[in-house]
Amino acid sequence: MAKKRRSKKSQKQMKKIISLILGLIVVVAVGFFGVESGIIGGESSLVPLVDDEHAFSLHMIDMGQGDSLLLSKDGKYALIDAGETMSPGERESREAIFAYLDSLGVKKLEFLLLTHQDYDHIGSAIDVLKRYDVGVVYDNGVEHTSKTYENLMTYLAEEDVSYKVVRDGDFISSPWSGVSIEVLSPPEDLIYKGKKADVNENSIVLKVTYGETTYLLTGDAETEAEEYILSTYADIDADILKAGHHGSSSSSTYAFLKAVTPDVVVISCGADNDYGHPHIEPLENFAKFTTADKIFRTDIDGDVVVTTDGTEYSVAVRNAPHDASKILISGNGVKV
């Protein structure tokens, strides 16, 4: 089941050596963000990739204390999670997601993948389905009794929306040439705590690869899911890591990060959130593998876009320039 990538570790080390330091380089780009701050692997100069029509991009939308990630390439788009952080009837996160997608001219989503059933990941899903043409909806198939999830499943059935359950070992049908989307978790028999399948631990974890660049997207996967992935796959090395569970101490263990060895870490969390995300423990762990100028947080940076042409990758932030001095401070104000 494990797959080997030729000299990936050495490629990443070379990228780190010749990467430019974020915060010192700011390049004006003709793009959505106006200014691009970034790191580039494989080149000695900053090359804006956001507007390269053949590049692949991960967009982490600043939608508050939740998740919504947009994938894009060649004018085709897909959404991973569509959360809502407010109580029903107050739709601030939904509006942030809509504003972002509309600014890019998105009309169709090739797929909507919901990593798990929590409100901060699916609360805006029905609204997304009503507003955009969605090809297929994926989730993990875990039974859940929340009204939000029940309403979603009813909507999918009534509107005859294509729906598929994915588990470890599956591949998402990629709408983009050269892009592979592999499901690493949850396991087929799921992860249980007591008599119930745990919602966070059964998050869909994706390994997205384009050329020599790999993204690891972890939803709210926690320690047991990380242990399962470590025990199942020999190679989970990735260039870009989407931190699990909004930077919670329940995720991003040292052992997991040692296997991933991320160069860039992106964290989705709301400003002044009630959970203290990101917690100090994962920040300490991230700092052992990369530097603050390569760790990005939506509560500080706003929307974050990581773009690759398959060899090089760059990072753009809405609140440019990226302020690395604020990154390694937890949501509770504790500094690494």
List where the protein language model places each region.
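Non-globular, low-confidence helical/coil segments that flank catalytic cores
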Residues: 2-336
